[in-house]
């Protein structure tokens, strides 16, 4: 046990952690030439393409130093803000962390939030400046930022490059010398912390865990504390490039368990595994149920694909327990599901995986967050969908979720960023200077305003320099109204949104203008209206396409022409009564990107 080292890597998106992890694996001969591909640990195609790590992964390496053999377990973490709970569990399974900072970009917001998480868990931090081979690298300045943040010595910071392999040996030595061995009791009752699970179509759910106390053997009868379910450990082992079965996994080591579990809901990240015969007194602290933050309706384009969509979502849920869904129906779109996601990136990934892995074409409605609606009798109801709102006369008040956001930016962009946050109803909490020209600004913002286009706007205002991180803060009372879009007097439920009173008129107007551009002209006039309750606040009209019915008349009597025009008018009127308006998918998406 004293020769085991468990460590994770903390880095912002794109700071090169997956590439550096490749070098560590290569250096310790974990990966040989034929298996070597870029980003060995990112095994979903989507992860490789987007260059982000979505799932946490783990891999074990052997390393020999000064004649002693060591076992190093690298637990790779996702760097994106949507997956921060997965990061926190991975961090809890480690004793040390490599803090990787890009030599060209410096410290970013998510690096800081994950770093604080690591410091709270008492991890030993090894600071590394990565990508020093870049022509635009500024290692000295980045080292200054790290020293200011960690209060460490300049000599402790390792300069490395994942591309050239510089500094890899130093990093491995530092892991062995500085990261403490796991502190567990081999004789205590079994406690394993689950930090991830993957779905295998043949073997069911495979849970990855770290043994905190005790040890787990093949064939043990074990219990998962949070779900209170019992299983037999059909196979346990360690995670090399592939899974390697062992007869037992000892204290402090990282391994996997296969017990024929069929659904991911039974394996919760952060749960504790213990023996049924000799159970641990309590679970490992820090387990929480992951709650979705963003909700959207997902509908199949062809109505008969509804059951296929359900099957696809269930399969995705096997691999991604944070996805929730329940059936709902919409007048405009037919039957579909209300899905809950951790955030916007998570939503995009689910959409892409539906498309790639299951060939499902879906329409996604405007995303919204969950609101707490209090009625006049004092009852409270969580609403995930604007159409589930009570009648306005019955509502006492509505509370919406607020987040505490931290934005790290160059001082040159403070003005525009503050304007953006104020436009999103943000409240400035405080600002702190990290170094001479970098500042961290804290805002309280309503989550509903962030959901749509905040991140894109932030990036474009700051020319890509600002980084953004957030966590849920509290619920606050807000004056929210339900905005409906009517086409020829018929409400389109999929376009309904909850919006703040102050923004409602401009939002309604912009929505009508946007829909006017996107809905194709029909043979009859289409009135697009935005309404709050019975009050119409904006209107646009799409002119009909018409045939020139009088073209065949030459001169002659005016009454002949009048008769034809009247006849056409009658026809148009009849069409308008029975005609339906097709709303293209582009229109639903355009609502998200209202500028």
Swiss-Prot record:
Matching InterPro entries = EF-4 (IPR006297), EFG_III/V (IPR035647), EFG_V-like (IPR000640), EFTu-like_2 (IPR004161), LepA_C_sf (IPR038363), LepA_CTD (IPR013842), LepA_IV (IPR035654), P-loop_NTPase (IPR027417)
* Residues the record lists as binding GTP: 14-19, 130-133
* Topology of the protein relative to the lipid bilayer: Peripheral membrane protein
Annotated tr-type G domain residues = 2-183
What GO terms in the biological process aspect are recorded for it?
A: positive regulation of translation
Can you state which reaction this protein catalyses?
GTP + H2O = GDP + phosphate + H(+)
Q: Can you name one GO molecular function term for this protein? A: translation elongation factor activity
Localization:
Cell inner membrane
Which keywords are on file for this protein?
Cell inner membrane, Cell membrane, GTP-binding, Hydrolase, Membrane, Nucleotide-binding, Protein biosynthesis
Entry EC number(s)? 3.6.5.n1
Q: A GO CC term?
A: plasma membrane
Q: Under which main EC class is this enzyme filed?
A: hydrolase
Does the keyword Hydrolase feature in the UniProt annotation?
yes
Q: What does this protein do?
A: Required for accurate and efficient protein synthesis under certain stress conditions. May act as a fidelity factor of the translation reaction, by catalyzing a one-codon backward translocation of tRNAs on improperly translocated ribosomes. Back-translocation proceeds from a post-translocation (POST) complex to a pre-translocation (PRE) complex, thus giving elongation factor G a second chance to translocate the tRNAs correctly. Binds to ribosomes in a GTP-dependent manner.
Q: What is this protein called?
A: Elongation factor 4
Q: Tell me the protein family, please.
A: Belongs to the TRAFAC class translation factor GTPase superfamily. Classic translation factor GTPase family. LepA subfamily.
């Amino acid at each position: 046990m004293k020769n085991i080292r468990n460590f994770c890597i903390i880095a912002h998106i794109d700071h090169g952690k997956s590439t550096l992890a490749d070098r560590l694996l290569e250096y310790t001969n974990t990966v040989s030439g034929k298996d070597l591909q870029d980003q060995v640990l990112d095994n979903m195609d989507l992860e490789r393409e987007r260059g982000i790590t979505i799932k946490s992964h783990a891999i074990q390496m052997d390393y020999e130093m000064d004649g002693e053999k060591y076992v190093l377990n690298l637990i790779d973490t996702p760097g994106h803000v949507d997956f921060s709970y997965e990061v926190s569990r991975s961090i809890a399974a480690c004793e040390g962390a490599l803090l990787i900072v890009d030599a060209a970009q410096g410290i970013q917001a998510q690096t800081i939030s994950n770093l604080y998480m690591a410091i709270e868990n008492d991890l030993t931090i090894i600071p590394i400046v990565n990508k020093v081979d870049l022509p635009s690298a500024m290692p000295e300045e980045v080292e200054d930022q790290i020293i200011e943040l960690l209060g460490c010595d300049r000599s402790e910071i390792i300069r490395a490059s994942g591309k050239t392999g510089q500094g890899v040996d130093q990093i491995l030595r530092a892991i062995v010398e500085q990261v403490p061995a796991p502190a567990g009791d081999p004789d205590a009752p079994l406690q394993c912390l689950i930090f991830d699970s993957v779905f295998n179509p043949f073997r069911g759910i495979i849970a990855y865990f770290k043994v905190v106390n005790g040890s787990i053997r093949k064939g043990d009868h074990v219990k998962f504390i949070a779900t209170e379910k019992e299983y037999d450990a059909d196979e346990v082992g360690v995670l090399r490039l592939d899974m390697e079965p062992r007869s037992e996994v000892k204290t402090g080591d990282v391994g996997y368990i296969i017990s024929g579990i069929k659904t991911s809901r039974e394996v919760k990240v952060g749960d504790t595994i213990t023996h049924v015969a000799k159970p641990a007194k309590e679970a490992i602290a820090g387990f929480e149920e992951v709650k979705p933050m963003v909700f959207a309706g997902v509908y199949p384009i062809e109505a008969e694909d509804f059951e296929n969509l359900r099957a696809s979502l269930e399969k995705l849920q096997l691999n991604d327990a944070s996805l929730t869904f329940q059936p709902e129906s919409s007048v405009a779109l037919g039957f579909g599901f209300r899905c809950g996601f951790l955030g916007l990136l998570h939503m995009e990934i689910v959409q892409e995986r539906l498309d790639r892995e299951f060939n499902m074409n879906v329409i996604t409605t405007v995303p919204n967050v969950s609101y707490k609606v209090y009625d006049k009798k004092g009852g409270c109801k969580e609403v995930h969908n604007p159409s589930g709102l009570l009648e306005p006369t019955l509502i006492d008040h509505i509370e919406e979720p607020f987040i505490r956001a931290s934005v790290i930016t160059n001082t040159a962009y403070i003005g525009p960023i503050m304007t953006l946050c104020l436009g999103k109803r943000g409240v400035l909490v405080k600002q702190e200077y990290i170094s001479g020209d970098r500042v961290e600004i804290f805002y309280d913002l309503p989550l509903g305003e962030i959901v749509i286009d905040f991140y894109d706007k932030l990036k474009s205002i700051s020319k890509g320099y600002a980084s953004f991180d957030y966590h849920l803060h509290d619920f606050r009372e807000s004056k929210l109204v339900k905005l409906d879009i009517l086409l020829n007097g018929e409400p389109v439920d999929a376009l309904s949104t909850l919006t703040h009173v102050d923004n409602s008129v401009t939002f309604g107007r912009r929505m009508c203008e946007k829909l006017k551009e996107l809905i194709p002209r029909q043979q009859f006039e289409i009135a697009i209206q935005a309404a709050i309750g019975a009050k119409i606040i904006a209107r646009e009209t799409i002119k009909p396409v018409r045939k020139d019915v009088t073209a065949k008349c030459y001169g002659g009597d005016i009454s002949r022409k009048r008769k034809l025009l009247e006849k056409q008018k009658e026809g148009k009127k009849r069409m308008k009564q029975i005609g339906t308006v097709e709303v293209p998918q582009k229109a639903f998406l355009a609502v998200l990107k209202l500028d």
